[in-house]
Amino acid sequence: MFKIINTLLLFAFVLCIHKNATAQQDWKDINTVEEVCTNYTETIENMLDQFNLDYPGLEKVKRDFENGNLVNACYELLEYYKNGNTASDLRKTLPKKTDQTKSETDTILNNVFVVQNVRGKVPYLTNGHRDWYYKGPNNDKEWAWLSNRHSQLNNVFNTYLETGNPKYAQYIDLFLKDFIILGMPYPAVKSSTSVWRGLEVSFRAKVWPKIFYGLLGSDYISPATQLLLLSSLPDHAHYNRNFHSSNNWLTMEISALATVAAYFPEYKNSEEWLDYAIETMTQSMKDQVYADGVQTELSSHYHNVSLHNFELFQEICDRANRKLPDFYNRTIEAMYGYIAHMVRPSGFRVMNNDGDRGSDQNLILKGAKKFGHEDWEYIVTNGQTGRRPEDGPSYFYPWAGHFVSRSDFDRDAHWSFFDMGPWGSGHQHNDKLHLSVSAYGQDFLVDSGRFAYTGEVAEKFRPYAQSSAGHNLLLIDGKGQQNGPRLANKPLGEDHFKIATNFDYASSSFDQFMDLEGSVKHTRVVFYVRGQFWVVVDNIETDRPRRIDALWHWHPENTVVKDRYTVKTLNERGNLTL
């Protein structure tokens, strides 16, 4: 009896020693299949459970896994991917080894990330992992979110392909291992944390497949990291499948779900993920794009974001040989048409709602080529190439309520944007009846744009940017507009606009103001005499005397002076007088 007890105690003691020895292995030193299977047995077993082991080519993986040989099953799985033809468009010819470097990427290798022009160095925790919850030098949660989308990792990946310097691939290996291990276990709940928020999940799910397939034959990416990545991708897909949002967030999250499904058809749930993605994305397009082709958030920036993700989804379905409804392609064409018709003569987009003043020229040229629209090419090249449109030069989108007036299509053309639409389904500003004006390549009257979402700038200026005070509107007794209707339930009728040979006319009203006693209604009429000038008439209907402040925001590059009853610019070329 004494001998038996001693044996049991010795056995227990040996088990404890083995377990502790395993736990003590530094995660950074886990590189081989054997090491990852020993240290993260449950994770790797769960990873293999995510695969359809009856998928053609996985016969050896199934045999070894069912026989309890986890290590061999993982070797066979990696061999399957190395020798397969899945995701042929992502597989890369590995570069020859060099010592070439790129200084910008070397900054990333020091864990210095630039997010929205803010530079921050991600610190290390006591366990040797990077602090993926670090919010940058300004303690900005947006900084942490964006850094966890792994665009910096994509940058390092591209630099490795360009230079062949092993240090870039080695950084990717350790980066992914660090991130995935520290993020375990997957929480499987909707979250707004720095790591597990829907947008960040979706961006990583698009970056990681590029890296996995692009570096499959590399000696600098360890088998352990490859297996950890394969274990985490189903978690990313699960999140985007079950916890996605709506509007443009949905397009990003669902296109990420489809990305994982299309590039990894071996996962058990890939077929269901793709079915769900097609159904959801198709319905989302119907819900968030008006009949005139404008995305319902009514921000040119997020219109482009949605378009990008709709197109990305279309490309994914094409690669997976999955057909989309005809209206899907027609809607994408209409979305391009809106961008082409709204663009300023300079090639920059409208800065409405949460928008940025970015160039749409290349995007429009891409759409023109894709759909054979030489008229769009003509517009965005100021008539240098393409074919002159049979309509225009002014355009009205009745569901969005967006009216653009032009004198012509040349670079010096007059251009104005008049907003008669609803508030928008997201990223809204209280800016109905706002008017922007440009001419001679110069912006004169401008929109506040987005400014920033979080951080010091946002705390100071975000409320102003969203309010009527940040737009070319009227304040009534110092009060701006309340939130208007989110969506249009019908297009604006012909009584609201007219486009004639020599003039444009547009008119709309708004009657909901913040904390204002009594009734008031603001009607704005914009009359543009083509090639000459604009007439803006503001009419106020009210039940009592009011103080009216008319706001006109000039682009800061203008030199503006007041001359008795007029305000005017003193630019060298191209001026505006009010």
Q: What name fits each language-model region?
A:
Residues 290, 294-445, 499:
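Carbohydrate-active enzyme catalytic cores, enriched for enzymes
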